[in-house]
Amino acid sequence: MIELAERHSFKLPAQCRALIELKSSDDVEQLAFEEPYYLLGEGSNTLFVDDFYGTVICNRLLGVCIEEQESSYLITAAAGENWHNFVADLRARSIDGLENLALVPGSVGAAPVQNVGAYGVEVSTFIEQVTAWDIKEKCWVSMNKEACQFAYRDSVFKQHPGRWLITSVVFRLPKDWQPVTHYAPLNQLQGHVSAQKIFDTVVEVRQKKLPDPKVIPNAGSFFKNPVINKAQLDGLLQKWPDMVYFPVADNHVKVAAGWLIEHLGLKSAFVGDAAVNPHQALVLINKAQATGSDITQLALKIMKQVADASGIMLEPEVRLVGQHGLVQLAVEK
């Protein structure tokens, strides 16, 4: 068995039967993909809550190609590239559009899976194509934006885990850059708002709000911000007039899950060494030697109390992996 604690940012004690590091796309077709298997990037959105009785395939594909076109840049990035370093390198080259997503943990290949988003920007806005190995059909596929079926923190890759091994992502970034600053604290920036100012502000805020996983093991935002309809919103605002929410399309709003957790007095909640981060309630942390059981019990405790108080069922944004694959958490309403 192979240790996995250093392979995921929450550093839970777990092992796997076998581990493969993929460093060349030429090797993809030779992989057996014997079940159970799990496709892993940098492990910043994965928690191994138990020993995994299968093979972990770590994507270590590297390389970035930039093609300048008349009105945009076409950038092809290998899936194993570190996301923040990729964004920072583009910013240094004055290729902008992804600056709101600075310091989002993980790899380039994980970005379309989660459709990562922050401060008003989702990565799907800029994705032109995803190249992947179709494990089921045993063939290469190039998937455009529509085929990826992007939604809020969702995609076809997340809906069908283990079906595709992403090897590269193509981004199109327009030269006619427009700042996105309608989310706090970016909406408080004064004077000329440059891409560098947005990048620096996002990095500063994230470093203040989110613990460094190298110091305090965590996986960033543990829960999604739930989306509810206006009728549900009206009912909750009668109960909690100061509840934090953001409008989204089609008569729906997005509720701040961190506000719900903190408002219900769960900011000091813990089970064993798993705890709610005192500075950002949406983040759960490993204080020292948390176990998979600690974190799942804490998550279920939070989900149940939020559901009982609001009727909202929080969904984990992170992926929980147990003995045979993904584990789904759910509580009775």
Swiss-Prot record:
GO terms for cellular component: cytosol. GO terms for biological process: cell division; cell wall organization; peptidoglycan biosynthetic process; regulation of cell shape. Its cofactor is FAD. It comes from the Bacteria. The keyword ATP-binding does not apply. The active site is at residues 153, 221, 317. Gene3D superfamilies: 3.30.465.10, UDP-N-acetylenolpyruvoylglucosamine reductase, C-terminal domain (3.90.78.10), Uridine Diphospho-n-acetylenolpyruvylglucosamine Reductase, domain 2 (3.30.43.10). It catalyses: UDP-N-acetyl-alpha-D-muramate + NADP(+) = UDP-N-acetyl-3-O-(1-carboxyvinyl)-alpha-D-glucosamine + NADPH + H(+). Its EC number is 1.3.1.98. Pathway: Cell wall biogenesis; peptidoglycan biosynthesis. Residues 12-176 form the FAD-binding PCMH-type domain. Keywords: Cell cycle, Cell division, Cell shape, Cell wall biogenesis/degradation, Cytoplasm, FAD, Flavoprotein, NADP, Oxidoreductase, Peptidoglycan synthesis. It is an enzyme of class 1 (oxidoreductase). It is found in: Cytoplasm. This is UDP-N-acetylenolpyruvoylglucosamine reductase. The lineage of its organism: Bacteria, Pseudomonadati, Pseudomonadota, Gammaproteobacteria, Alteromonadales.
